[in-house]
Amino acid sequence: VKLPRIGIVRTHESTRKLARRVAAGTARIRSATVSFGSGRWFVSFSVEVERCGLAPTLPESVVGVDLGVKSLAVLSTGEVVPNPKHLEHALKELRRLGRQAARRQGPDRGTGRQPSKRWRQTHARIARLHSYVANARRDGLHKLSTRLVRSHTVVVVEDLNVAGMVHNRRLARHIAGVGMGEFRRQVEYKAGWSGQRVHVADRWYPSSKTCSGCGVVKAKLRLSERIFVCESCGMSIDRDLNAARNLAALVEASSPSCGATENEPAGNPCQSRTVRATGIATGRPAPHGAGQRRHREASTRD
């Protein structure tokens, strides 16, 4: 990479693919940004490419995805994607490095004291470990989102209130370590590339409380109840699998001409949002005051 006032700089990753596309005229570099983080220098390119919308080539297939903490995702097909828990596995080393950094001579703005070399080295190790955890989490989400988009024409996800869920101090770290918002972002832009659809279920749709067999909605469902037992038809099923099947049923039972519909907690029909290849979402916001009623359930959801 040739940078202004610096010259030619070797990169760790190969840039031959980008160079070939630029030489062929199928890509044009608009800008390059050099940044420093986790003890390493990075250069990122903003490239303009021509990407045409692709029509779905797969047979019609709908999959519901229920994200959680115990399992990363449960699909309506019955597949359970385990949660790798990268952050939990690195906590022991992070705490050890934190105690080690506390014993080093750090900076002091009052006296103008500079940090010691060992303090800088310890914090660089902490930054590299955090970067490793973030990269491992992002890599797992990329693999899952790519597999779902390539094997299904419609992916149904929930409009989760992640900002409200992390207010639960007991589950905040576990929820943040899953990357629910990042998963939805990846699925949406990858579906736009391949011509698939992403259906975003309404935030107030009771997917966990609704029986996937008969459609009856339970009044209460505690977080400790991992098995959903319907009092109407007697069906017994894992609560996460039940929620995933309900999400898939939103699209399977809807009409393409009028858009997918679902039921509010009170039973009234409401419009869901479908993100197509253009990335445009349609629908209406939740009713006024519903956030306070559903905040307790959303903050303890897994």
Mark where each language-model region is:
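Short glycine-rich phosphate-binding loop at a beta-alpha junction
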Residues: 144, 148, 153-160, 199
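Long, charged amphipathic helices and adjacent flexible linkers at domain junctions
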Residues: 46, 100-127, 135
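Phosphate-interacting basic helix/loop segments used at nucleotide- and nucleic-acid interfaces
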Residues: 43-55, 127-151
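Short, glycine/acidic-enriched loop or turn micro-motifs at the edges of active sites
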Residues: 69-71, 162, 243
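Short loop/hinge segments at the start of secondary-structure elements
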Residues: 1-109, 184
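Short, conserved catalytic/metal-binding motifs centered on acidic residues
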Residues: 65-66, 148, 155, 187, ...
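Positively charged, low-complexity nucleic-acid-binding target-recognition regions
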Residues: 54, 174, 178-302
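RNase H catalytic domain
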Residues: 160-176
